[in-house]
């Protein structure tokens, strides 16, 4: 694929120690059961959805703007349209403990445009971030190891993470896509229209919450286009 030929952009020390501490402190407050998911049978890879209710952007706006900036720059550098919609699909906090990793060398972040990974802790062993380069798994541990380091890459570039052998590997993962900013408690698969999960949760919560959740889950751009079409038809 085209993405496989693109380089990973490494940003050593993109975030300061204070910014990393802000992210970790914020992540520690995000404890609602619906926004936490184990991605392994033995709980060695736990993901918390920090974008739930759009909290990451609202609570950490300056950090969000910095990370979106490097993501958009990568998008444009690889031929993307700067005027294209480029919104946060998901913000995830990953904690991987010994035995865990992301082992599929063919893994991609399907449906997204650009992914940003930020290292939040250096107190672990193993867990090297790798990408496939001409069929070989290349480690980026030399540039993506210290807290505040970031790697930015096209989401369809194949990547994986070696097994963690000691400590806890803590990483912030942001994915940007050509869709609306999502606030649902998962990695949304719908770039258009209302999120099925958000609407389903609203139904379970009760009719009083349904309307607000439904309209919050809608794609604002599609709503604007529909309203404009109605006005033209009048």
Which residues are covered by each model-predicted region?
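Double-stranded beta-helix
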Residues: 4-6, 31, 132-134, 174-227
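Non-heme Fe(II)/2-oxoglutarate
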Residues: 1-85, 193, 199
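Short, charged low-complexity intrinsically disordered segments located at boundaries
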Residues: 52-63, 99-108, 202-206
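Catalytic core of non-heme Fe(II) oxygenases with the double-stranded beta-helix
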Residues: 72-197
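Long, low-complexity, Ser/Pro/Thr- and acidic-rich intrinsically disordered regulatory regions
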Residues: 230-234
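A subset of signal/propeptide-processing and intrinsically disordered low-complexity segments
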Residues: 38, 102-104, 228
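Residue-level detector of intrinsically disordered, flexible termini
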Residues: 2, 6-9, 26, 54, ...
């Amino acid at each position: 694929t085209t993405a496989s030929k693109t380089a990973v952009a490494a940003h050593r020390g993109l975030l300061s120690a204070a910014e990393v501490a802000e992210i970790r402190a914020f992540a520690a407050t995000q404890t609602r059961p619906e926004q936490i998911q184990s991605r392994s049978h033995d709980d060695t890879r736990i993901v918390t959805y920090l974008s739930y209710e759009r909290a990451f952007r609202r609570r950490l706006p300056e950090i969000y703007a910095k990370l979106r900036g490097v993501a958009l720059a990568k998008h444009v550098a690889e031929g993307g349209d700067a005027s294209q919609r480029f919104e946060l699909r998901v913000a995830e906090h990953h904690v991987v403990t010994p035995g865990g990793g992301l082992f599929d060398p063919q893994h991609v972040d399907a449906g997204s445009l650009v992914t940003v990974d930020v290292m939040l802790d250096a107190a672990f062993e193993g867990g090297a971030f790798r990408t496939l380069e001409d069929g070989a798994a290349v480690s980026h541990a030399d540039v993506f190891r210290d807290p505040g380091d970031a790697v930015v890459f096209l989401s369809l570039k194949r990547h994986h993470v070696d097994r963690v052998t000691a400590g806890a590997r803590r990483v912030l993962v942001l994915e940007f896509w050509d869709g609306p900013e999502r606030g649902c408690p998962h990695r949304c698969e719908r770039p258009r229209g209302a999120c099925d999960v958000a609407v389903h949760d609203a139904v379970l919560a009760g009719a009083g919450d349904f309307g607000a959740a439904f309209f919050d889950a809608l794609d604002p751009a599609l709503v604007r286009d529909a309203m404009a079409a109605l006005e033209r038809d009048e």
